From Swiss-Prot:
Coiled-coil intervals: none
Role, per record: Required for rescue of stalled ribosomes mediated by trans-translation. Binds to transfer-messenger RNA (tmRNA), required for stable association of tmRNA with ribosomes. tmRNA and SmpB together mimic tRNA shape, replacing the anticodon stem-loop with SmpB. tmRNA is encoded by the ssrA gene; the 2 termini fold to resemble tRNA(Ala) and it encodes a 'tag peptide', a short internal open reading frame. During trans-translation Ala-aminoacylated tmRNA acts like a tRNA, entering the A-site of stalled ribosomes, displacing the stalled mRNA.
UniProt keywords, alphabetically: Cytoplasm, RNA-binding
Pfam families (alphabetical): SmpB
Protein name, UniProt field: SsrA-binding protein
Source organism of this protein record: Xanthomonas oryzae pv. oryzae (strain KACC10331 / KXO85)
Length: 167
């Protein structure tokens, strides 16, 4: 007896599940364009990611010889990892993008001074995808302004809720 497909799968919708987020990227950079990239991973890395042992906070993407690599992201191997391979937690991982996207990113990084920052790692139909963003660094006063704006929005919502409740 076969299982009935769920409503989401029957309609062709792709289910995504977030593995890791880089919240610090939103705080430290002005994020502009976002790209979805595949990752060239080894078997032990997939198992470790399924166990939730990935961290992209310290990672960044780097263009080397016309290809983009993820550097500094950590995937901690499981204890049961294979004995015939030596797992390296912070190895360089190749990002899989279309050639046109790579060329576009390459020109923006080299000429305009942008940085490639990983923002999210997630599952997309049984494949691990990485969202990378073209970003420019924030100055300290920009970070303070963003914090003030966030506090003001929170206070404004609080006042509106209180006013609507009293009315």
């Amino acid at each position: 007896m076969s299982k009935k497909p769920t409503k989401d799968k029957a309609n062709g919708a792709k289910a995504t599940k977030t593995i890791a987020l880089n919240k610090r990227a939103r705080h430290e950079y002005h994020l502009e364009e976002r790209y979805e990239a595949g990752l060239a991973l080894q078997g032990w890395e997939i198992k470790a990611i399924r166990a939730g042992r990935a961290n992209i906070v310290d990672g960044y993407a780097y263009v080397r010889s016309g290809e983009i690599y993820l550097i500094g992201a950590q995937i901690t191997p499981l204890i049961q990892a294979s004995t015939h391979t030596v797992p390296v937690e912070r190895r360089d991982r190749k990002l899989l993008l279309h050639r046109a996207e790579i060329d576009k990113v390459l020109t923006r990084v080299e000429r305009e001074g942008y940085t490639l920052v990983p923002t999210a790692l997630y599952w997309s139909s049984n494949k691990v995808k990485l969202e990378i963003a073209l970003a420019k660094g924030k100055q300290n006063h920009d970070k303070r302004d963003a914090a003030k704006e966030r506090d003001w929005q929170r206070d404004k919502q609080r006042v509106m809720r209180r006013h609507n409740r009293d009315a």
